[in-house]
Amino acid sequence: MAEAVPASPASGLGLHRGIIQWLVDNFCICEGFSVPRCLMYEIYVETCGQSAQNQVNPATFGKLVRLVFPDLGTRRLGTRGSARYHYDGIYIKKSSFFYAHYCYLLGKKSCHSGNLIAFGKFPDYSNVLQQEETCENHSPIKKDPMGSPVSPFRRCPVWEQELANKYSCKLVVFLADEYCNYCRDILQNVRNQELEKVEDLITSFWKSRQQDTVMLMSLPDVRQLLGCYDMQLYKGLEDMLLPDFLEDVSIQYLKSVRLFSKRFKLWLLGALEGFPAILQISKLKEVTGFVKRLRRKTYLSNMAKTMKMVLKNSRRIGLLKSDLRAIIREGTLDISKKVLEGDSDHEEEPESHTEMKCLGCLISLLETSTDLAELLNCVSSNLQVLVFQPSKNKEDFIKLAASFQLKWNFLLTAVSKAMTLSHRDSFGAWHLFHLLLLEYVIHILESCIEEEEEEDLGSLQDLLSDDQFLTQPDQALFHPLDSLPTSECASRNVESPQVTLKHTSQSCGPMGMGSVVLQVLGFLVDTATGNKLVQVLLEDKTTESAVKLSLPVGQEALITLSNGQRFVIHISDVPQSSENTYCRKSNANVQGGLLE
């Protein structure tokens, strides 16, 4: 191969741009396929680098390949002595002018080496074509014989109403309707195995957004609402694509699932080109999490599928059990007490540590069961006792999870080391089991953190939609927010009313007025009558009783708390410039019977 010759920066930059464009025009991401590095460079030299002055060396060419495909993997394929490095996850486009030549060279090299160099199984041109068609056309959705409909997509009407109250009502309502329909359509098309329509749905939705809608979607609280809907979308896709990684599915199916998730991400990022950076970052974070979770589950599924085959082999599992018992019994594990003890002040024997107990439970279970689900449930039970139950909050959980994972990894690695040094025949089976146990613990811990984040978002929804009070006043004195079907949120320039609170109790004793708090929650307009409504919360901290009301402006309401205290709330309009105008969600203490 020719080495690159010195060139001026300008000519070098132009040369690199040409190579990058050549890579983009002729190669694409294709999960499950690989391209030999030497063959890719050979085609480049034959087609683009015929002049020595216009060639780059293989190292520079490899850097440019990774610049175009940053997530590209590398695999060494072939038998011992004739293995070659491959770029894993890309393939030459069928529309490429060099496609036929590439297939010819691929078959030629395969025949000469006596190996199947590429990930494809066939050296001839027609079979390579057939395999690529299989990859592209294989649907990653299993047919549902029951034909069950897509899970209901949960709307957040009160949350939407809060945002509409803060911004333009019509624009928020329109955006929420459009976005939810967009998510539902994606789920329905995936359920119907119409994956080719998903790209069009994504592109058409984002490219049809007007500038005012885009700016609204970029606001922090609106992004949070849309993130809630994205969470439901991705959760629904995961449940349809791969609900359980222990389910028996084909390797080709797993490849198709990974390919679809990666394509989904590319479709979304492509549709978001030109949008505000903050919106792109938000959507990138959400879709990256979706791709990461599916990749983790497909990886686990692949390992579980292989491990099940090992567990069905009585000879292999017998060797594994005897070798593990021998290693534990002979004390050949190279384990440092300091590593297992961590922050513990008392010394214990290595066998008495929690991680050793967890491993001991697995070894004992192998004596009676070869069901992979039972083995993994054993790990889950130990995690529940050692990590989940002792955690008082999220910080404690993260600390305990990190500590367990570190010690668990160290322990399993020590077993692998002992297996290697003692030349155990079951090393291959243990190595697979080792990887599966590591990934499964990571899956459980990361899934818990993700679910907790989802629960936090769900709690926010519940908080915004909660119209229940500790003490219910007379129904004639108030109108609950959810009981106003004709109400819509007022625009932001609605005048804030003045709220006055008067104490009317006949008791002669001290009344503890400082413990009563009146909070203005929001403003509404009844479109049917044109009346202004104010949502307020009256709370007595001493008795922990509260009343949540939606009151019309210009009227009084008589409120009785559970301790017998009675109050009159009067709401009146004031000019916008008045110093007594109260902002939304402001707290105020009652002093002298009036709201200051």
Curated annotation (Swiss-Prot):
UniProt entry tagged with the keyword Chloroplast: no
A Pfam family recorded for this sequence: RFX_DNA_binding
Keywords, sorted A to Z: DNA-binding, Nucleus, Transcription, Transcription regulation
Primary localization: nucleus
Origin: domain of life: Eukaryota
InterPro entries: DNA-bd_RFX (IPR003150), RFX-like (IPR039779), WH-like_DNA-bd_sf (IPR036388), WH_DNA-bd_sf (IPR036390)
Localization: Nucleus
Sequence similarity: Belongs to the RFX family.
Protein name per the record: DNA-binding protein RFX8
Organism: Mus musculus (Mouse)
